[in-house]
Amino acid sequence: MIIWLSNFLEQYFPFFRLFEYLSFRAILSIITALTISLWMGPKLIAWLQNLQIGQVVRDDGPESHFSKRGTPTMGGIMILTAISVTVFLWADLTNPYVWAVMFVLLGYGAVGFVDDYRKVVRKNTDGLIARWKYFWQSSIALVVAFALYAYGKDTAATQLVVPFFKEVMPQLGLAYILLTYFVIVGTSNAVNLTDGLDGLAIMPTVFVAAGFAFIAWATGNVQFANYLHIPHIPLASELVVVCAAIVGAGFGFLWFNTYPAQVFMGDVGSLALGGALGTIAVLVRQEFLLVIMGGVFVVETLSVILQVGSYKLRGQRIFRMAPIHHHYELKGWPEPRVIVRFWIISMLLVLIALATLKVR
């Protein structure tokens, strides 16, 4: 919205030309989202406590988690509010890529909200029935997939970018829709599975969003896109502002979610953030880099798949408990050690993924 206003005012006040610069708006986006989260946090936590909207803890989980019972959840509301207000203020709202990410973010946030609400009201860990959760996740993802395919058909926006091979960029055709669906739904659920310890999911999300901010900027800049041998997609550059909003809101939420957490994001936050990251990866054509950057999310998800598969096929468990962060807790690692080590791994994976952009 501000960019529209600046276009009008810059003819009278040259200062407003600053708002045309993507880097300036990205910085303001981080500051705005961070400020909103820090301001909103205490109020939301107090409101959730008054409503007795507390975390439901599994009885078969680590004993150290029993003390978390009753800690306010649904803190993802502050994240989504901060991101939404910030994007509305600083992003170019004529850019369809911005709306695609926001549609998934808020749509998945709504699904997560219903899931959290059912968990809190019924005081169990079941939440929204699985088939309905996947139905709404799938519906939202498919709407975006079909819309993006129709908009960018047979252009760089629907090519498959393969790491390490600068000349391998095949057109996906209708397979683009299927890939987009799996990336969005898969990333959403992967982040959701990772959100099991204080601050465990939010920092990798921040790291990945920061990585995608750079990739979006490079993809939208014709010189850098050619230099890195990646598709040039002009609309992608505005996603820098969206990624910056995720970073700012994430840091603001971490202020209250760091160990010992005052609030949990709940499914309203984790499903939404995962869906947004998946959508951004699709829009900048870096689905493979998402697998690398989001390696923590991938490993958490694989640990659940392997655990369930092994138990059904062999009657034996591979890990003491899945997702894998619980395995390390049951091995005796203090929760902060698990969290910080996963953060370090996540940061390194993002740096490795960015390095692959030049290794072609």
From Swiss-Prot:
Topology class, membrane: Multi-pass membrane protein
CDD domains reported in the protein's UniProt record: GT_MraY
Record-annotated membrane-spanning stretches: 27-47, 73-93, 94-114, 132-152, 168-188, 199-219, 236-256, 263-283, 288-308, 338-358
EC number(s) from the headed UniProt entry: 2.7.8.13
Main location: membrane
Reaction(s) this enzyme catalyzes, per UniProt: UDP-N-acetyl-alpha-D-muramoyl-L-alanyl-gamma-D-glutamyl-meso-2,6-diaminopimeloyl-D-alanyl-D-alanine + di-trans,octa-cis-undecaprenyl phosphate = di-trans,octa-cis-undecaprenyl diphospho-N-acetyl-alpha-D-muramoyl-L-alanyl-D-glutamyl-meso-2,6-diaminopimeloyl-D-alanyl-D-alanine + UMP
Keywords tagged on the record: Cell cycle, Cell division, Cell inner membrane, Cell membrane, Cell shape, Cell wall biogenesis/degradation, Magnesium, Membrane, Metal-binding, Peptidoglycan synthesis, Transferase, Transmembrane, Transmembrane helix
Gene Ontology molecular function, alphabetical: metal ion binding; phospho-N-acetylmuramoyl-pentapeptide-transferase activity; UDP-N-acetylmuramoyl-L-alanyl-D-glutamyl-meso-2,6-diaminopimelyl-D-alanyl-D-alanine:undecaprenyl-phosphate transferase activity
Subcellular localization(s) per the UniProt record: Cell inner membrane
GO biological process assignments: cell division; cell wall organization; peptidoglycan biosynthetic process; regulation of cell shape
UniProt entry tagged with the keyword 4Fe-4S: no
Annotated GO CC locations: plasma membrane
Pathway: Cell wall biogenesis; peptidoglycan biosynthesis
NCBIfam families: mraY
Similarity section: Belongs to the glycosyltransferase 4 family. MraY subfamily.
Function: Catalyzes the initial step of the lipid cycle reactions in the biosynthesis of the cell wall peptidoglycan: transfers peptidoglycan precursor phospho-MurNAc-pentapeptide from UDP-MurNAc-pentapeptide onto the lipid carrier undecaprenyl phosphate, yielding undecaprenyl-pyrophosphoryl-MurNAc-pentapeptide, known as lipid I.
Protein name in the entry: Phospho-N-acetylmuramoyl-pentapeptide-transferase
Originating organism: Aliivibrio fischeri (strain MJ11) (Vibrio fischeri)
